[in-house]
């Protein structure tokens, strides 16, 4: 019975090869998006290609609904890939956001799709919101530019200024309802921005495609916004969604029975606008071949996409400012900077600048020792790239990593590789090093030296470096009558050092242990 069922399912499967819809190789990147996008996504009937068209009349934005296994991802891949074949990156830009716990858009990031400006994989809501904010900024920028040119829309602007590149933009958000899973300020702002993009994007060449397994329920977009999206594409979905995506008297979506079978409707769901079609099938290996060909065709003429991968740590090797600093020590002006990671937003990398002012120290707090070690090491790399000196005097490292830990010796190896062989101080010499560094701070503060060159003390595992911990019997009495201990010297460096160019970068596992190690002040 099982075999009969599988055979029946296979017999019902319809497969339209992607080659049926893709343009010939000599026509790649020849399309003009001045008046809109026109991209084949499947086969309607025996020989006709089903076109996805936006930019003309009321057909400006699209809503796609399809339950798991319906072929929604296949549809998105066919659309994105064929659009990238039809139009050059000068004509079309893509902003791709995937809220699912999957990797639907990862291949576009790995192969650096030249049309993509932003690719979000397993995206956080905050990053998705920043994409909407960026596109809202595009609306304002283009609005100002169009007014100066005396035109009303993208087509008119392209005619008035044919030499100025102004690509048409398509925003694709899969599982868009994730914006609204919480009734908070972020969800409210996302709803307002999406509504603005849908209502105003038409004139400025910005189009929106929203996909979801279900568009019903509380976690969805306002009906007034959905009503502005004339293009509806339904794959297999529930009866409730079949009525929601089309009009109440259009129940055709309930009759869809196989994966990839879909209805294209560009009349706000009116039954007379239904067009039954089969989504083109694009295997992963074929898609990868196409993307590699597109990357070769781009030949480095276009910037790589901004990629946000929610489940992946930031890759320091991909830091553009750090790479520039490594290539040229003078590439970054101003105070010393360490880069800490990627923001959950479209903006420059998260960084900390060590200015010569009180409090300019960096505290890392948290129990993820691997992450803290990565941050400390990345900081050493950035500073070593900035201050290329044969001496390691500008940086001192106290490593509190246990000798039997898997990460033991990582900081010492990193320092050696960076040409800082004496940076990591043996534990028996911590007190001596603190005395010397505190003395340097005092000499600078008193004006006994003109040296203000930056110096850094890295403490990895503040809670484990015993010499730094404040004495349990230190109640503040008689301090003038005794020599300051290592803990007190460390406190002086933290308090007085930044103003004279001596800074501390310290990691501690918990706030409780931090208070045990050093005074709150």
Segment roles from a protein language model:
Residues 6-23, 284-340, 347, 382, ...:
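Extended alpha-helical interface modules used as scaffolds for assembling large macromolecular complexes
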Residues 8, 153, 158-159, 313:
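Polar low-complexity intrinsically disordered regions enriched in Ser/Thr and small residues
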Residues 22-153, 159-247, 253-255, 323, ...:
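P-loop NTPase catalytic phosphate-binding loop
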């Amino acid at each position: 019975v099982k075999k009969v069922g599988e055979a029946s399912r296979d017999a019902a499967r319809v497969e339209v090869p992607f080659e049926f819809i893709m343009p010939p190789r000599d026509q790649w990147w020849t399309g003009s998006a001045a008046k809109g996008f026109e991209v084949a996504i499947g086969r309607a009937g025996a020989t006709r290609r089903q076109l996805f068209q936006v930019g003309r009349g009321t057909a400006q934005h699209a809503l796609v609904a399809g339950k798991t296994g319906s072929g929604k991802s296949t549809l998105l891949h066919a659309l994105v890939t064929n659009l990238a074949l039809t139009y050059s990156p000068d004509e079309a830009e893509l902003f791709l956001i995937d809220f699912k716990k999957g990797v639907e858009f990862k291949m576009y990031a790995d192969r650096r799709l030249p049309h993509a400006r932003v690719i979000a994989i397993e995206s956080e809501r905050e990053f998705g919101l920043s994409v909407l904010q960026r596109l809202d900024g595009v609306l304002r920028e283009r609005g100002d530019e169009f007014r100066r040119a005396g035109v009303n829309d993208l087509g008119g602007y392209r005619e008035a200024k044919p030499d100025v590149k102004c690509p048409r933009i398509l925003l694709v958000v899969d599982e868009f309802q994730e914006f609204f899973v919480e009734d908070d300020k972020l969800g409210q702002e996302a709803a307002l921005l999406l509504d603005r993009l849908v209502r105003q994007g038409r004139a400025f060449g910005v189009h929106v495609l929203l996909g979801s397994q279900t568009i019903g329920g509380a976690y969805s977009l306002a009906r007034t916004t959905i009503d502005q999206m004339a293009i509806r594409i339904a794959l297999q979905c529930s009866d409730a969604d079949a009525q929601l995506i089309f009009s109440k008297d259009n129940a055709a979506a309930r009759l869809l029975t196989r994966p990839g079978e879909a209805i294209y409707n560009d009349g706000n769901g009116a039954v007379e606008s239904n067009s039954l079609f089969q989504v083109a099938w694009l295997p992963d290996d074929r898609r990868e071949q196409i993307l590699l060909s597109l990357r070769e065709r781009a030949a480095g003429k276009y910037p790589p996409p901004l990629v946000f991968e929610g489940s992946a740590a930031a890759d320091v090797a991909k830091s553009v400012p750090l790479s520039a600093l490594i290539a040229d020590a003078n590439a970054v002006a101003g105070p010393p900077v360490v880069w800490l990671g990627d923001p959950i937003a479209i903006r420059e990398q998260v960084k900390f600048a060590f200015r010569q002012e009180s409090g300019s120290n960096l505290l890392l707090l948290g129990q993820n020792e691997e992450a803290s070690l990565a941050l400390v090491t990345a900081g050493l790399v950035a500073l070593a790239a900035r201050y290329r000196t044969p001496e390691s005097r500008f940086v001192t490292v106290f490593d509190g990593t246990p000798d039997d830990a898997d990460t033991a010796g990582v900081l010492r190896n990193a320092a050696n590789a960076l040409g800082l062989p004496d940076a990591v101080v043996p534990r028996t010499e911590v007190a001596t090093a603190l005395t010397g560094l505190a003395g340097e701070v005092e000499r600078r503060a008193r004006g006994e030296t003109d040296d203000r060159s930056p110096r850094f003390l890295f403490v990895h595992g503040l809670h484990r470096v015993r010499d730094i911990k404040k004495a349990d019997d230190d109640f503040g009495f008689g301090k003038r009558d005794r020599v300051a201990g290592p803990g007190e010297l460390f406190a002086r460096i933290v308090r007085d050092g930044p103003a004279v160019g001596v800074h501390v970068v310290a990691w501690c596992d918990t706030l409780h242990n931090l208070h045990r190690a050093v005074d709150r002040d």
